[in-house]
Amino acid sequence: MASQTIVEVRINQKPFSANKMHYRDGKIDTKEYKEFRSNIRELLEGDYGIKPTDKLRLTLIVGYSSKLADLDNAFKPLLDSMQPCMGFDDRQVFEIKAMKNHVKKGEEYIMLRLDRMTDNQWGKRQAQMFPKFHIGEKE
């Protein structure tokens, strides 16, 4: 069984940085983060039939206008915004494939795809990533 795409979308919005999610020692969400979460909810809210036992793969390309932006800063705010409106927990994400692109200011975006992986695919992916260590192979 091949992986099943749950959602694939381009969001014409600036990727949000994990560094700007909270203030007051991480206790309060920033206004900008609340707005980002609301936008993601409007775009993605729905019943996707994701089960608690599903293994998920997130694939994304983020278009940043700042050449100083770190790719990994996009993961946490995006996943935390997706999970309540799509019905999954980010602990179900077993693989993230990501790239960044530099774009002009005002042309920022997030392209994302969320796939359901089979156990067999998950084991094969581990072996492909580090063949030297024989990860995911049956003994």
Residue locations for each model-derived region?
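Acidic, proline/glycine-enriched N-terminal capping motif
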Residues: 1-139
